[in-house]
Design a protein with these regions (language model features):
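Conserved ATP-driven motor cores of ASCE-family P-loop NTPases powering translocation/secretion/packaging/pilus
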Residues: 428-530
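Short, surface-exposed polybasic-aromatic patches that bind anionic ligands, especially phosphate groups
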Residues: 545
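Compositionally biased amphipathic helical and low-complexity segments enriched in hydrophobic
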Residues: 7-10, 121, 442, 516, ...
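Basic- and hydrophobic-enriched, low-structure N-terminal and domain-boundary segments
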Residues: 1-151, 155-163, 168-170, 486, ...
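P-loop NTPase motor domains
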Residues: 22-28, 126, 133-436, 451, ...
Length: 595
């Protein structure tokens, strides 16, 4: 049964009680006025009023009470009818209330200390504090940056935010996608100067990269499944998707082999090279179903020792396929893993130096350098990001009680070119609470839709901040114009009629106009950008001037002597520092012959 809100029922009607009491006094005045008819009483009404109001006590005469109640009901009914039929006017907002944001609008979201903010534009910033005193001003740190080629995505946004590395209140690690390899050259020195550990993964030249082994981050059966899912999602090519059967069959085989490698192989053999060797050794004879290749024998031996082993169960499902089918599956696997036949790539993934699970422990800057023209090896970068998100979320939950001590910002330039990150739409919705943020840099929003299909809108919806730096892609311009809304403007028209007599007319009216139309967005000034922050009016502001940043003087853009030398860094990276922690092993060589 619905409860009656007594307070809401009584309080609005209290004024009418006083009206009723006042009406009883007026009725009493008329009743006490001298005279026998109405006209005489009205002439002597003042005498009646003086007599009635001589005492402020309401009249309880039956006639007066009836008049008071009737008056209160009549006025209450009139107010009710008036309210129902009232016209709703919004002066100067008739066709829309859109406007540009001001300094007062952004003020609640900015930290007083410059270094504790994310740089959005020249005049707008967003605090790194994910739990501000006023909860209604809390915003996630996910940012969507859209700008055509040459709009300054790197210079006006990415580099300034990378230089926000001096905060002691909110320490931050960075994961930066560096398509041309010039961001680390420009900003690497400034980061090192502020205590950052630099790490580099390079898919352009494997010899000039630190080693990355996805197998090093497998700790459980679910990690194996995650790795296989990522591998398949990012090596499927651009053609029409094949039969789902073959993908599932490949998944079974990869899961079985990687499970065997993880649980049974020595640590130094837990890599893609071993996986390739396994597949190469899996000979299948269509005319001999009972033939056993070396891998079959290895799994038979493992089954005898551990019949319930995870890898054994997966391999048994794969072996249900007939000889011809199994051969087709192996061919498909060989084609998918063809890049790992390159010796340099096998060397790159032989062991791990990136230590992705430590980015939330101490200030680190991981630069992922990739080609902006060739995406052959971009699947490796996507695997890196997928494992990074999973590892950091698990560590935040299992070790740090839900929040990493060092916030990890992923600045993903050319986000559409690194390949698909599985479940990104779910990750961007959940990583905020773990002190992780994801910033996607695109040339057009259509790139995101092409890669993530229906999930693209979910990803954009979980970006509390979006910045448009300029561009001409029609879909992006149309969506932005609609999001900015309409403002109400004044229109002044003049008319002139000519005939026997000349007449003139003037007409003033209100009209609705888009805050910025599609054609206006297409010719947006190169120094301007549009910022949208959830719950705040949009801002039309200047792009951030990199030369105004306090750390600009330590970048290669300011002076070439501060250029970060990648080759020199990689050649000296194994030199130990006094505070480095290392594992020491003691070996007994007493039985060895003396050289």
């Amino acid at each position: 049964m619905k409860q009656v809100n007594v307070k809401k029922l009584i309080l609005p009607n209290i004024p009418y009680v006083f009206i009723a009491l006042l009406a009883t006094k007026v009725s009493e005045a008329v009743r006490l006025a001298p005279g026998s008819d109405v006209s005489t009483k009205l002439l002597n009404i003042m005498t009646g009023l003086n007599t009635a109001f001589h005492s402020l006590v309401p009249s309880f005469h039956p006639i007066d009470l009836c008049v008071g109640v009737a008056a209160a009901i009549a006025i209450r009914l009139a107010v009710y009818i008036k309210g129902k039929n009232a016209k709703k006017f919004r002066k100067n907002l008739e066709y829309g209330s859109a406007r540009w944001g001001t300094a007062e609008d952004i003020k609640p979201y900015v930290d007083p200390a410059f270094e504790n903010n994310i740089i959005l534009t020249q005049t707008e910033r967003l605090t790194m504090n994910s739990r501000p005193k006023d909860p209604k001003t809390a915003r996630n740190k996910n940012v969507l940056i859209v700008g055509g080629s040459g709009s300054g995505k790197t210079r006006f946004w990415l580099k300034p935010n990378l230089l926000q590395c001096t905060s002691k209140t909110y320490p931050t690690s960075f994961v930066v996608t560096d398509p041309k390899g010039d961001i680390v050259v420009s900003c690497g020195h400034a980061l090192q100067k502020n205590g950052y550990q630099i790490k580099i993964l390079k898919s352009l030249n494997f010899k000039k990269s630190m080693h990355y082994n996805p197998f090093a981050y497998i700790h459980s059966e679910k990690d194996i499944l995650k790795l296989v899912t990522t591998l398949i999602a990012n090596t499927k090519g651009e053609g029409k998707a094949g039969d789902d059967f073959w993908v599932k069959a490949e998944t079974l085989l990869y899961t079985a082999l990687i499970g065997y490698i993880h649980y049974e192989a020595p640590v130094e053999e837990q890599n893609f090279s071993t996986l390739i060797e396994f597949i190469n050794a899996m000979e299948v004879r269509e005319d001999d179903e009972d033939f056993k290749n070396p891998v079959d024998l290895m799994f038979d031996e493992l089954k005898k020792r551990k019949p319930d082993h995870f890898a054994v169960r997966q391999y048994a499902k794969f072996k249900l396929s007939a000889g011809k089918t199994a051969k087709s599956i192996l061919i498909s696997c060989g084609a998918r893993l063809a890049p790992f036949d390159i010796q340099e790539l096998r060397e790159l993934t032989a062991y791990d130096e990136l230590q992705l699970d430590t980015l939330g422990d101490r200030k680190t800057a991981l630069f992922i350098i990739m080609s902006d023209t060739d995406d052959t090896f971009n699947f490796l970068i996507s695997m890196c990001y997928t494992q990074l998100f999973n590892l950091l979320c698990e560590k935040a939950d299992d070790v740090y009680g839900g929040r990493l001590p060092v916030h990890v910002r992923c600045l993903i330039d050319e986000a559409a070119n690194i390949g698909q990150i599985p479940r990104l739409e779910k990750l961007v919705a959940t990583i905020r609470s773990r002190e992780i943020s994801c910033c996607l840099v695109l040339q057009a929003q259509s790139q995101l839709k092409a890669l993530y299909k229906d999930s693209a809108d979910t990803i954009v919806g979980n970006m509390d901040c979006s910045i448009f730096l300029g561009g001409k892609e029609p879909g992006t311009l149309k969506e932005l114009a609609a999001a900015l809304g309409k403002e109400t403007i004044d229109s002044y028209n003049t008319g002139e009629s000519r005939g026997r007599e000349v007449s003139h007319s003037l007409n003033y009216q209100k009209l609705g106009k888009e805050l910025m139309s599609v054609d206006e967005l297409a010719v947006l000034d190169g120094g301007k950008c549009i910022l949208q922050l959830r719950g705040v009016r949009p801002f039309l502001s200047n792009k951030y001037d990199l030369t105004k940043h306090p750390l600009y003087r330590y970048t290669a853009d300011y002076d070439k002597k501060y250029a970060f030398d990648i080759e020199r860094f990689l050649s000296h990276r194994l030199k130990l520092k006094p505070d480095d922690a290392v594992e020491v092993y003691q070996a007994d060589l007493s039985g060895e012959p003396v050289a």
